[in-house]
Amino acid sequence: MLIRFSTVALAAGTLVSGLSPSDIPSDTPISSLLTSAQNHLSRGETIDALVYYDAAVARDPNDYLTLFKRATTYLSLGRTAQATEDFNRVLSIKPGFEGAHAQLGRIKARGGDWEEAKKQYHMAMKPEDAKALEVAKGAAKLAEAAAKTGNWEECASQADEAIKVAVRSLPLRELRARCRFESGYAAGGIADLQHVLQMKAGDTSPHVKISAIQFYALSELENGLGSIRKCLHSDPDSKVCRKLLNQEKAIDKALQRIARNLENKQFTIASRQLIPTGEGDGLIKEVKEQVKILREDGTIPSSLPNSLVSRLVSMACEAFHEVGYIIHFCRGCSPTDIMYSQKT
């Protein structure tokens, strides 16, 4: 006879496991189940270990040590909600169990729930963890204060300290992303937004911001296109994501045509594709207008560079030079405002 379990956690765990709960004979001693779980853990087979822990818990739901081991296994898989539930079950069976309080304290601390984490650490008799928690809490407050005064580097620095403890705090990640962007640290801000995406399932706005910054501010066209495609993968019906993807694809295609013309020494054609002529406004103006909109709505922070426009201007300078034009950059105006006159 075989045991078949139907709990949600078990079903989820076995989706990527080579082991099925039906593979475990019903008369397997609990001690053997626990030994098998430990053996799988030692080999890094965490999902398979979880199947054995599930079987052991189903056989004896009041064994708090087995529940605790399953909870730590859940935690190693990033299943915080299930781990929290098991740790709370442990405490309902064994009140005051310090190991469960300590783990709950760490879970709460990682999420930036300072007061609940402090409470759990107190019950776990973990004064050093409680001390580190207070330091992180203080740093978080200093980061918020620095942001209010526009001291972006101080904000990012204090947020660094807080996030060492509160690694899964959504407000802190969003705050540090903002402060990093405002201080000109684009890569760091993008890294934080990628964490935000993991914590805010279904929210496409970080995808849009990441893509626009990569594509326009940093001139990382492939990365920008890849990020906005992830947005549509997350929400295929998103009009905002679709609009930005179409916009970026059109620019990328136009830029590739210009690059080919320059490579083939068709400099006149390339220059006409870049600047306003009777045939159109040119790619530089088109991109500048798109960037203006993205900066005005806050998608691209004003502190970040204009690398794509600068790249296009450089291409225009190359084309103009080759066809015999003198390039003028007027003092006090934008370096993207190109003026030119024919050589005599």
Give the location of each predicted region.
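Alpha-helical segment of the N-proximal tetratricopeptide repeat
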Residues: T28-R59, G138-V165, Q256-G280, M315, ...
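Residue-level recognition of tetratricopeptide repeat
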Residues: P29, D63, F97, W114, ...
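Register position in tetratricopeptide repeats
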Residues: S42, S76, R110, A145-T149, ...
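Canonical positions in the second alpha-helix
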Residues: A56, R89-V90, M123-A124, E161-A162, ...
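Structural marker of alpha-solenoid helical repeat scaffolds
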Residues: R59, I93, P127, V165, ...
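Canonical tetratricopeptide repeat
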Residues: K69, Q103, V135, K141, ...
